[in-house]
Amino acid sequence: MKYILFILLLFISCSKNSESNSSNEDESLASETEQLSNDYYEIYLLEQLNENRGYCIDIKGSKLNADPDNGLQAHTCYSYQGEVSVDQGFDNVKIDDDEFYMPFFDVCMEAENTSASSTLKLRGCNKNEKQKFKFNNNAEIVLNDNTNLCLTVSENSREGGGGTPTHLIRDLTLDNCSTDISSRQKWGLRKAQ
């Protein structure tokens, strides 16, 4: 009986330590994520269009649970919440080197192809031509391989899955740079608002 009681107490003690360690690990990850997000910059559309919180380049999914395999979209900027979210966070130093790098997910923005209407995906950074973009003097993000193609948000928006009021989403493509649609092709770079 003493042996069974000892085993039971040992099991309970280990379970409590495991829960405590798990909780500490979760808190540590949250703290690291918060610190990292303070170093991120968001890329936002200069025109708010129909979203007063603005549109930012965003990984499809939700913050830490975003999946880079799902590609990029324009989504309500999260900076109104006080910080740049990891799924909208870019390394501004790498942007100066024509690389749109998202450090939390260790991926770079990449064009599906180098023609109009190309979609954007995320891949491991390897400096291939489809990953080289320039933030030009006209506030456009253009593909180095075809500077006539601008990063463009779609004309129509749809509701996302969260937020109050509900967040909005628009598709992102590379389209011919044009003054007719410049309100959907001009971008800025900032830390949290």
Task: Please describe what each predicted stretch is.
Residues H167-C177:
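Low-complexity, intrinsically disordered Gly/Pro/Thr-rich segments
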Residues D67-E83, S118-K127:
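Surface-exposed turn/loop modules enriched in turn-prone residues
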Residues L9, E51, G71-L72, P103, ...:
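Disulfide-bonded cysteine motifs in exported proteins
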Residues C14-K16:
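N-terminal Sec signal peptide cleavage junction
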Residues I12, G54, H75, D106-V107, ...:
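Extracellular secreted precursors and ectodomains with disulfide-bonded cysteine-rich loops/domains
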